[in-house]
């Protein structure tokens, strides 16, 4: 721990001491001010904010013990106090999900799968409420998505999708997280064993 905070300005500034309560503040403004080619590919302000909020939601689900807040245009949009996992899941996904969700905690060898999975009555038209974490890291993985889809195959029909917040824990040597620059894709050493 340090007796004070530090500030680093991305405008070419040096690291300097700053006053701050305990925690971390990340502020982004004019990110592509000097790269107009990148700036022209940005979506609308509301779409870009929604992407930032989704990143916060994923981090908050992965770490319910940490408080999070997000602001936009000088106003606070979301504030989450540290909480247990159940409370955090309710805050992030909503009150409708929680009564339909069932806790699960299963182990097989060195694998452990835990989290919340919604009953078929809470199926979704999209994949907006599917959160899969591997060793605490949010991932989008075709293998895991397929395994989850198969688990609901006999009870979900048509274009409906299950809702879940699932955590897969395994030996870090059994998964390569350096597959995608954003670290949202992984490669498993024993993909068939994971899928079962």
What do the PLM-derived regions correspond to, one by one?
Residues 1-196:
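N-terminal phosphate-binding caps/lids of nucleotide- and nucleic-acid-binding domains
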